[in-house]
Amino acid sequence: MKIPVLDKGFVELVDVMGNDLSAVRAARVSFNMELKDEEKDRRLVEYLMRHGHESPFEHIVFTFHVKAPIFVARQWFRHRIASYNELSGRYSKLTYEFYIPPLQRFGQTRIVPEKVIEKISHVVNESYQTYMELLEAGVPREVARIVLPLNLYTRFYWTVNARSLMNFLNLRADSHAQWEIQQYAVAIAKIFREKCPWTYEAFIKYAYKGDLLREV
């Protein structure tokens, strides 16, 4: 499952271990019990979420492949209870792929948005040209990359359990977060909802503190 985000980015589900019933099994083992009928299992998911018993949800694990601007990735990596592996600018030549914001991102600027985009594009072109010139001159990749701006796209793998994923959604699928990472959070939420519908529904009903997912 792959969802386009921003102008050139995406969120792709690579792997998932477990589902709603994984949390149910983990919770019932405390009482030496197994799965019951579907309605009781679903009510247990709601009970766990409503009362803040979140550890059973750690037994549901997702791995995502994400392509995002560097400045988005740096915000993302602040969510530490997860595992990350990122494209290396030391070992790979970085591709000419930069995020250019849509016109509505510029608000009440003193110059017209089209001129802002023109200035951003000019800096991007100049920096990448300099990067390539440095590489051609024999400068190591790890040094040449320092001239590239934060809107360069990077790619990374993110492995995260459902409990930590819900924390990510609480903080990033919210209007207080930067708009760009909001778009990624909404994409993550759509995948989460598809793979764990009971958990997602209970999360939105009892534990979600943001303001973007009520209509997703």
UniProtKB/Swiss-Prot annotation:
Its cofactor is FAD. Binds 4 FAD per tetramer. Each FAD binding site is formed by three monomers. Keywords: FAD, Flavoprotein, Methyltransferase, NADP, Nucleotide biosynthesis, Transferase. This is Flavin-dependent thymidylate synthase. Coiled coil: none annotated. One of its GO terms (biological process) is methylation. Catalyzes the reductive methylation of 2'-deoxyuridine-5'-monophosphate (dUMP) to 2'-deoxythymidine-5'-monophosphate (dTMP) while utilizing 5,10-methylenetetrahydrofolate (mTHF) as the methyl donor, and NADPH and FADH(2) as the reductant. A motif (ThyX motif) lies at residues 78-88. It catalyses: dUMP + (6R)-5,10-methylene-5,6,7,8-tetrahydrofolate + NADPH + H(+) = dTMP + (6S)-5,6,7,8-tetrahydrofolate + NADP(+). GO terms for molecular function: flavin adenine dinucleotide binding; NADPH binding; thymidylate synthase (FAD) activity; thymidylate synthase activity. DUMP binds at residues 75-78, 86-90, 145, 172. FAD binds at residues 55, 78-80, 86, 161-163, 167. Its EC number is 2.1.1.148. It is an enzyme of class 2 (transferase). Belongs to the thymidylate synthase ThyX family. The active site is at residue 172. It holds the Pfam family Thy1. Homotetramer. It comes from Thermotoga neapolitana (strain ATCC 49049 / DSM 4359 / NBRC 107923 / NS-E). Residues 9-206 form the ThyX domain. Pathway: Pyrimidine metabolism; dTTP biosynthesis.
